[in-house]
Amino acid sequence: MDKRLNAICGDAIEELSKLENGIVDLIVTDPPYNLNKNYGTSQDKLEFEEYLEFSRTWLNEAKRVLKPDGTIYVFMGMKYISYIYTILEQELGMTFNSWITWFYTQGIGKTKGFSPRHDDILMFTKNPKKFFFDLDSIRVPQKYYRSVNNMRGANPGNVWEFSHMHYCNKNRKKHPTQKPDRKSTRLN
């Protein structure tokens, strides 16, 4: 198996348009959540329909470059996750596989309402039966010892508890929405 990893950083629509059809095995993407955050280069606030059209455009390009057995993981906050799901399944005809909840202990402080403590990750594939998923590489220790069944470890499930990459963490880079490495290794 070819284990090359090519990370492409840049404007998704622009960079994806440079790629040929059907050449990418895996896409892991963390698009803007459209929450009016300033990330230094642009404001993250589009009108509702404009944001959905932006999402349709880059998701269509992502599907185009995926191999027939390719997989896409999309990180998204709660405000637009259902719309992204609908675009992928209903408009682009991709196959839903998993809805992962990333639970973290440090949330955004709020005085009116509950503090957000999770983000969502959607897993979609182009083919419902033929796609790569290496469960053995991401197993977690069994909670209870059993001498039967799968002692190699358990499926980690779809609720993942990982802390944010805190701003004072020595491994923190300059990316404004950096994800913890341990979480990213589960996306295969």
Regions of interest found by a model, annotated:
Residues 1-186:
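Core catalytic lobe of class I
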